[in-house]
Every structure is written in structure tokens, then in C-alpha cells.
Amino acid sequence: MRARYMLGFGVLCLLTWAVYVSESSPTDKQAKLRLMSVRRARQNKSRQGQIIKTRASSTWINDKRQQMQGDEGVQFRRNVQSRKVLAQRRPAQGGTRNPIQQDDGTPGARARVSRMPSSAGSPNLLASFAGKNRLLVISAPHDSDGYYRLMMSLLKPEVYCELAERHVHQIVMFHQEGELGGKIRRITNEGKVMEEPLDTALIPRLMTFLKLEKGKFGMVLLKKTLQVEERYPYPVRLEAMYEVIDQSPMRKMEKVRQKGFVQKCKGAGVEGQVVEGVLTTDSQVDPPTERRKEIRKPIRRPTTTTTPAPTRPTTTTTTTKATTTTTTRPPTTTRSTTTTTTTTTTTTRPTTTTTRTTTTPRTTRANTTPQWIPAHKTTAEPYYYNRRDRYQTTSPPTDSARYRDNHTSKKEYNHRHTNTIPTQHKPTKVRPTKKKNGDKDISNAYEEKYDVGVPTDAYPEEKEEEIVPTKRGKGKTDKKKKKDKTDKLSKKDKAERRGKDGKGGKKNGKKVPKILEKEDYQKPTKRPPPPPPPKGTLATFLDYFESRRRLILITSPTEENSMYIQQRDEYLEHVCEMAIRKVTIITIFGTFRNSTMKIDHYQLEKDKPMKGLRQEDLENQDLIMELRKEYGMTYNDFYVVLTDLDMKAKQYYEVPIAMKAVFDYIDTFSSRIREMEQQKRDGVTCKKEDKPRSLENFLSRFRWRRRLFVISAPNDEEWAYQQQLYALTSQACNLGLRHVSVLKLVGTDLLDMGGVLELYPINGSATVEREGISATLVRDIRNYFQISPEYFSMLLVGKDGNVKSWYPSPMWSMAIIYDLIDSMQLRRQEMAIQQSLGMRCPEDEYGGYGYHHHEGYQEGYHQGYGY
């Protein structure tokens, strides 16, 4: 037994010695060194990957624009050392793949292999945009090409901030022999266009790489990864490009990060300015030496001074300031007496009420004596400042008659309050002139009715602003709080002034004591009146309109409610009639407990403009709830209430009502009869037109009822125009079933302009109704849809009023347009109803335009538009 143990121990020692001898041999040492070098190479590669990631993260934090523009791309700069290692490994891996992909293991880089051009087949120019910018490449034979001129006319100066927000740069190329040329248009964050010439040697390579045809106009929209996003053989509206770009998921993240970018860009004031030069931030591809230097010092990047964090709150505050908008609508009808109407729209949203506290107060404007400016009263000034800015509007000029803005500028505001001193707010010591007192009595009865309430502690300086001429004016709130102090100060001032007059002062003379004696005598009569109801209550809100306006209150769940849209389109056609009857429309959107309010005043020119209401009242949910309770509008449905001047409800409507019936009923009111007699003596009437043809009224006829197919040409002899008319022959049934109306516009000058509207029956019959269009309406329609009168173009407008497609050339086959219409969601519902009723065009007239799917370029042209 012991012999076995000894034998085993000896064998174990022998094996240990053999292993030691083998490891100490020279060949094994070389193999071990090779293994260690391989391990070190792998460790170096992993460290380089970590450095690249650290550099990417530091760049993400330090440069906001680089962060946003790098959403769809990856970093294309790599270390030269890693490239050498990959070159050594390439023979073992086949040597067929791009080294850029071998260096980057991310999914985006793997997917980019099929999209990124090889270094031999693509110009390096595109690499400067990769991962940072989208690119719009415009190719034309020469700069006088019609399509090129049309596209450049669409690139107006006011669109470059929108392009900059989407990180879109442009390359323009002219490829005709003898006229080779081009330019690179880089757009800065301020909307400025930096132009630099394009090397003519790159134009053939770009044409080949982007597969653009020579001798023809063409455009290509490239993603940030240099992948082709969309191809356009014709000029297209920029809104169509925006839709394609905005469908990207990363574009949605850009929108969130760039809130307020467009407003800030337009605020710079240089949008659309073209400057010759090179944009430093978007330089072309760096040489290898530059890239090697940047890779070796990636940790220094966090020391840059760019800090994007403070810019986010500034952009958000600019978007939340637009809490109230005031719009003015021109009059639709007038008489020779220049009767005009003014509409003031005040819209509110309760989610932005906190931004008013950021306004800087102005403490030295209302008072003239520094010692009478209390420190705690300066918080009320932003309220008046915001209100003045909030209700400022600009009214476009009209041909029929001018109409006034329904706002008060700073100069008018100060002047009115300088001459106006409400009796309820008059302090103990006021020394206005007799003329100012007279103005006070006149204006109080008409205009200052809403502002007579006693303010709360949040608005202690309201009375001081209304008493600008006074030196030592105080409001009622201050009287209640500091009654004893006020009496002492008044007695002291009185004694000082009498002492000065007794000494023979020449400044005041003998008039001052008389005025003071009168005021002292009238002082007891000013104190007894009880305080009016506080602001923000329903009684104060209705007092603002009582004896001055008739109200039409409308409640609707949303602004897209069909019944509300029908009622709105109805009353917008009778603006002048509502102004004569002093009608104010209050529209409340939302549920009973969460609503927003909009107020429209319809006034004549001679009427005194209505003062804007306080923002707190328009956003006060309790006030809106009380208003709905007062008139029985507690349900979340469409509802209309009509009141007289006494604010008492006269009529209720649960469905949209014709305004003619409303006007006839208003004319039976006793208060209205007196107005009619006075207006008849003054000759105030609305000019009657056979058919109102304003642009808004014209387009409202088709909204949610018809689709519009607009054809515009310089003249009726245009070849493209005649070809399109030939394609429309025998299409009455197809157009009628799809609820399409054809609008033909011709002429370039206003004297030559004209148009025809063709209405096809929706039951598919072959009868067609035609209406003439005036020259002014043709001009307005072209301006609204941005149609150039010098070129042939066609538009398809949906029932929602938005342009669905644009065709710069005639469509030989209407099947393409029919397929686009049939793909819309609303049209599918119409098709289901028509098929259930058996409504279908005959096959011989149908011309094969069934509900089947057509293939071709146009299908790809509209693919992804989300119609």
C-alpha cells in the first residue's frame, strides 16, 4: 500500500518537472508573447471605442445644434490606428466590406453600408452634410428653365427659418453643356443663406450618383444619412416636403427640442438674406490629419463654453406668451355713407396664465412725485402693460372703406386716462382742470363702466394709473387701510398751501385755495356710495356689455364640431348686419368644467371701440361656469342663446340657425326699434350684393362639402391648359361621385383675369352647373394658394380646405387623381355608402377609372404623405 503511494507521488513530480521544462523553452516563450500582443491589441481597440463614445457624449452635451442634427446619422470620423488594425484583419475577412462599417458596430452603421456611397464613386461634398443636415438637390439645364424659376419663386425669404428648423441645406446645379455651374446654399440658424460656388467637376458625379437625368429638371431630397427620401421631377410646394420630413421619428424629437426656434430665427431679422461666403459651422470633410488630432484629444471637448441648457426655458417662454389674440375682420358690405364694421376676437387658453408674472414692472411712469410711489404697489403695472400689448392689432386696408383697430396704443391709452378720472376712483386731493373734469363726465357714462370696481390686493395700483394728472392720488383700498394717515397728510398739505398763499406765492395765485375749498366741500359726497362688485364676478362681466351690446352665446365641444362650423360660416357672411345690430358673439369651447372663451365684437366705424377684457376674466373657469349656468348652457353640446341689451335671454337654439331669422327677431325688440329709427335718419345701412364673393365666403362653401380641383393657366390658349380640359371630357360622373368641383382660372393681369366654377352633381348625373368668377376673386384665390399666374399649375384641395397635391403639368390620365382621392379616409366612407346604394358610373364612361390600384411614378410621388 505504501509502495503505491510513493509511486504515485513520483509520477506527479515527474509531470510537474516536464511542464516546467516545456514552458521554459524558447518556442513556447515566442508563442506566449504572440498571445499577449493579441490581447493587448484587443484591449487597445476596446479603449478606442470607449474614447469615441466619450467624445460623442461630450459633443452631445456641449453643442445643441450638433446634438439635434446628429439624430439620423452617426459620427463618420474614425481613428487612423483602428483603420490600420482593420487593414491587417481585412485579408482574413475577405476584404470586400467597407472599412467604415468594420470600425463601427452600431446598427445604424450596419444599415448604412447599402446607402453610403463608396469613396471612389461619390464626391466628398456630400460627406460634409452626412449626419448633420438634410439636403435638397435641385438640378436644371440652365437658370432660365421654367420649372427652376417656378421652384425658386416658391423659396421665398420667409421660408428659410422653416428650412433651418428642419436642417435643410440646398445644392443647385445647372448641367447643360456650356452652362455648367452651381452653388451650395447653407442656411444658418438665423435664416441667412450662405452661398458658395460649386465645383463644376463635381456636377457630373453628383448627377450620376443621385440618378438625375440630363436635360430635365429634377429634385432629390436626401436624409441626414444621405439616403434618398423623395424624388420630385417637378417643382413642389414646400409644405409637401415638410410633411415628408416631419414623418421621421427623429424629426418629432427635433420638434420637442427646438420649441420656439422659428420665432427666434425670425426675430433675428436676417431671414432670407443671401451672403456670399462659407458657413464655418458646416465645413466640408476634414482631412485625415485633422481627424487624427480630434480623436487624440476627445476629453478636452467638455471644456467648451457652449451651454445649451439656458436656451430651453427661453424658447418655452416665448411660446407660452401667446395667450390672447385679437383679430380684425374687414366689413363685407358698406353704403355710400362709409359704414364699416370691426371685429375683435379675443381667444384665451387657461394653461398659460403663469407667464404674466415675468413681465418687468414699470414703477416711475404713472406718478410724478417720487415719495408717493409705494414699493408694494409695483406688482400691478405688468397687468396693464400686458393688457395693452395683448390687444394691439393691425388692420389690413380695404378698398370699400377703412375700419379701425379695436385696441388702444400706448399713446392713446395714456391720453385717455390722463383726461379721464372716474368718480368712483377720485381721491381726496385731485387738481384737474375744468376741461378734464368735463371729459371725465362724458366718458364715464359710456366707456369706463367695466373698470369701476374696487380692486383686490393683487391690483393696488389700478387707480393710480387712472389718476395720472394727480400728484397725490390714492385709491379706495389705500383709504381703508391708511385712513388716519391720509387725513393727517391732507391736513398738512392744506396748511402748507394756505401758508404759501398767505405769504404771497406767485406760482399758485388765488385759484388754488378756491379749488381746494370746493374739493373739501365735495369730499363727504364721494364717500357714501357703496363699493361696486369686485372684478371677476358674473355681475361685473355682464355690466360690461349691458346697455351697449347684444350677445349671441354659443357653446360647442370643440372648434371642429360640424354644427359649430355650420353656424360660424353662416354668421361670417353677415358681418355688417351684426355690426348694425350691435351684436357680440361669445363662443365657449370645451366641457362645462374646462372651457376656453372667445369674444367677437362687431362694430361700425363710428362706434367707440370696445375695450379689451381682463385676461383673468377670460381665463376664469368659475366665471365661465357661472355664465353657462346663468343662461342654461350646462350641457356639453352645441347650444345658442340670444340676449338683448338688458342681458336677458330672449331665444334659445339647439341647432344652427339662419342669421336672417335671428336678425328679423332682433328687429322686434323695443330697444332695436329706437335704434332703427335713429339709423334710418343717419342713413346707416348695409349695401346689398347679389352674391357675396369674398375669398372667405367662397371657400366656406366647399369646406366639408366639396373637393376643389383648381386649374390655373396664363391664358385659355395655353397648350397644357387645353390638354387638361381634353382629359376632363366625359368625366362628369367620376368627378360628381367624388364630390369634386373644377375651378378654372386664367389670365395674368387683373384686367384679363377670369374664372369658371363647374359644379358636378353628387349623384353622378351628367349635368354641370357653371358659375363665373370675378377678376378680384381669381387674384385672391391665387394669392391664397400661392399660384403663380405665369405658369400652368393644378391643385387638389380636400374637404378640409388643405392642399392635397400639386400638379405643375397636365395629367393625361385622371386615374392618378382618382386613386389619390379614393385613398382618403373620408372618401372611403363615401364609397361604402355609394356602393351600398348602387351608385356607380357606367363602364364605358368610367374609362377604367375604378377603385383598383394604379402603379406608376405618381403613386410613389404621393407615397407617405399621410392623406
Swiss-Prot record:
Residues 95-104 have a biased composition (Polar residues). The keyword Metal-binding does not apply. One of its GO terms (cellular component) is extracellular region. The keyword Signal applies. Its main location: secreted. Residues 83-121, 282-539 are annotated as: Disordered. It comes from the Eukaryota. Residues 301-370 have a biased composition (Low complexity). It is found in: Secreted, Extracellular space, Extracellular matrix. Residues 426-435, 471-483 have a biased composition (Basic residues). Residues 288-297, 401-412, 436-451, 484-504, 514-523 have a biased composition (Basic and acidic residues). Keywords: Extracellular matrix, Secreted, Signal. Residues 1-18 form the signal peptide. GO terms for biological process: extracellular matrix organization; positive regulation of cell-substrate adhesion; somitogenesis. Binds to various extracellular matrix proteins. Promotes cell adhesion and matrix assembly. Belongs to the CCDC80 family. This is Coiled-coil domain-containing protein 80. It comes from Danio rerio (Zebrafish).
